[in-house]
């Protein structure tokens, strides 16, 4: 990965860090206000170039953590982390200490304690139950606060504190974008309708993601397009033999929208050969403008499933 990009200290499964070099060059140049509607680990938002950034996520405890990191001196953050590690004797094997800290966090909701918990939790996942209690299990022999996380945290805090960033914790339906103009830009990486996983189920003790939410988001993006506001949507068209029919129809109904295939390497596949694995994950970045770096990628009609591989991807070869 290009060292020019800062990696989030939150190891979000499904995060975009490893494909930043593919998607960020597709963004418009000279953005006034960059809006990340589903910020998650903030890998995209923290690395996108703009005069102002708005990072939004409906997980209020995640945004509370970012706010804490935004206003707290780095030395104080690191001191708090070290104190908690020593106080609860946290390690790769001490599950009892982890459980005690988790109980403490659920009683107090200290944002920095949440960060420590995430560092030692299973797969570094962020999960809350319906009572808004953090309930991710211990990451035995795999998860801890290590040198890599510390390095990422330092770089992340530095950018978070020097950039012009507004942090919001709203459901995407309630996010007011009425003041945006043609110099602003909205990026969306929502939960994916046709995939499953704790990183994108949209729940974690909060609102889930189903067909209703998918339609509302696509309608919201159409509204931005009507106002002349540029947007980019990360999503999955195909996954393990499934097709996101809502997304496919939406693209067909909006012939000016552009599909930019993203190589995620989720499976052994090559999108530009007619023998592409039909069970491969096909991730795309849909834009309502032609990216400067791929100006020849006008959106063709999406063919039927029968000739999807043979025709469509041959037409979409990158130049």
Place the predicted regions along the sequence by residue.
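Class I S-adenosyl-L-methionine
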Residues: 1-54, 58, 175-180, 184, ...
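SAM-dependent nucleic-acid methyltransferase catalytic core
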Residues: 2-19, 25, 29, 74-187, ...
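Short alpha-helix immediately C-terminal to the canonical SAM-binding loop
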Residues: 63
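Conserved SAM-binding loop
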Residues: 66
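Glycine-rich tight-turn/loop motif centered on a GG-T
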Residues: 204-206
């Amino acid at each position: 990965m290009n060292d020019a990009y800062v990696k989030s200290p939150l190891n979000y499964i499904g995060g975009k860090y490893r494909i930043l070099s593919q998607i960020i060059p597709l963004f418009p140049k000279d953005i006034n206000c960059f809006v990340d509607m589903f910020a998650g680990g903030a890998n995209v938002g923290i690395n996108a170039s703009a005069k102002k950034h708005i990072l939004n996520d409906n997980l209020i405890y995640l945004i509370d953590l970012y706010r804490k990191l935004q206003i707290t001196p780095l030395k104080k953050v690191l001191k708090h982390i070290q104190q908690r590690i020593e106080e609860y004797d946290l390690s790769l094997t001490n599950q009892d200490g982890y459980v005690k800290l988790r109980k403490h966090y659920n009683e107090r909701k200290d944002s920095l304690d949440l960060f420590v918990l995430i560092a030692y939790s299973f797969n570094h996942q962020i999960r809350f139950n319906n009572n808004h209690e953090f309930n991710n299990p211990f990451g035995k022999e795999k998860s801890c606060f290590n040198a890599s996380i510390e390095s990422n945290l330092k770089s992340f805090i530095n950018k978070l504190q020097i950039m012009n960033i507004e942090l919001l914790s709203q459901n995407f339906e309630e996010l007011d974008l009425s003041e945006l103009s043609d110099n602003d830009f909205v990026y969306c990486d929502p939960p994916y309708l046709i995939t499953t996983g704790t990183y994108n189920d949209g729940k974690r003790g909060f609102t889930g993601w189903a067909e209703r939410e998918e339609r509302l988001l696509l309608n919201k993006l159409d509204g931005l397009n009507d106002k002349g506001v540029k947007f980019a949507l990360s999503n999955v068209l195909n996954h393990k033999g499934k097709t996101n029919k809502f997304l496919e129809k939406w693209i067909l109904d909006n012939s000016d929208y552009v599909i930019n295939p993203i190589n995620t390497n989720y499976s052994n596949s090559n999108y530009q050969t007619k023998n592409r694995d039909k069970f491969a994950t096909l991730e795309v970045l849909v834009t309502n403008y032609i990216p400067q770096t791929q100006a020849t990628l006008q959106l063709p009609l999406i063919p039927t499933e029968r000739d999807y591989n043979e025709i469509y991807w041959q037409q979409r070869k990158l130049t």
